[in-house]
Amino acid sequence: MTTGKSPADNSYLDTLDQIIKDTIAPAAEDIDQTGAFPRAAIDALGQAGLLGLISAREVGGLGEGHRTATLVVERIASTCASTAMVVCMHYAATAVIEAHGPNAAREAIARGEHLTTLAFSETGSRSHFWAPIGTAKSVDGGVQIDAQKSWITSAGQADSYIWSSRAQATDGQITLWLMPADARGLRIPQPFNGLGLRGNFSSPVTAEGVIIASDSLLGADGGGFDIMMGVVLPYFQLMSAGFCVGTMNAATNKTAQHVTRTKLEHMSQSLADLPTVRAYLSRMRIKTDMARALLLDGLDALEQGREDAMLRILEVKAAAGEAATEVTDLAMRVCGGAAFRKDVGVERHFRDARAATVMAPTTDVLYDFIGKALCGIPLF
């Protein structure tokens, strides 16, 4: 992705590219086949300081923000979507810890020794992550947490979860907690075995009488919604769009390679010599670049404090998610029967792209939010 702006020190991109070449790319197909967690990639990113990409310099991090996090996720997604989603969730959760978490956790993340993730969606409220059913109540020894989380990326692999619950003191409000992943009473009912993103370990997690320290509170009791909207949402929306752009770009490039190299020997032509094939490929490129252009404008809007910044934040994931579905559909169509073979490579991107429209906030929810914003109706 052309970032639109160049960080003062972008040597981390060279480091990232080397990790992608040496560690992420060689493991991508195996992760998809077996559903293994990309532990080697996460360890390599941690050792290189990239898990601390958005951690403040004062705690040893790189001190970067939305733009660079989005770029990193996009680059990884073009090679391994599972690894990219793990990193996306880590950065979104890290943003909360940076804003409201303890220095010990911040420093561990900056050192590359701590992987974190979000734990918002629940069985009882599905993709309406702003309406947790799970509870928190003060007890002897701390706070008791009970909940049924429907999806947590890196479940059982992360070191901590940014965990949402109903507020203790105020009905209808949300509270966030820094939940140790090894807390007694946390249980993963079933392992993840999905259509796409097969190595991201997005499993349900149940909390039954989990006791955590009272100082695990992130922000104020009842202040979770504002943190979700003000801290998490911009990071998650932008990085999710970057994830989609990376996936689309990979699918488009692989499709172009396939049609260029594949011959119709009886006609002494390649598939690329067919106007219909070129037209479909052009649509793929245009859709990818349109999503990228909106993403870059969203980043600009946020950084410049424009009035339309929140509208753009809502738009980027909706647009990129729909585009990713369309572009990877076209990749399968253009590559024909060969697309169903693993060696062409586009079917993996086709499966991985399906997640973008259903991850909360889903595309349909975003369409509703955008429509409300345009009509001057409160979102909630």
Residue positions per predicted region:
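Alpha-helical transition-metal enzyme core signature, strongest for iron centers
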Residues: 245-248, 252, 284-291, 317-327, ...
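Alpha-helical scaffold segments that form or flank carboxylate-/histidine-based iron centers
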Residues: 233-237, 272-281, 309-319, 347, ...
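Glycine-rich phosphate/pyrophosphate-binding beta-alpha loops
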Residues: 150-155, 233-239, 356-359
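A short core secondary-structure module
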Residues: 148-187
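Glycine-rich flavin
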Residues: 36-47, 51-153
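Glycine-rich phosphate/cofactor-binding loops in nucleotide/flavin-utilizing enzymes
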Residues: 335-380
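Glycine-rich beta->alpha junctions and the first turn(s) of the following alpha-helix
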Residues: 194-287
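C-terminal helix-coil-helix/basic helical segment that borders enzyme active sites and/or dimer interfaces
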Residues: 25-33, 288-319, 332-340
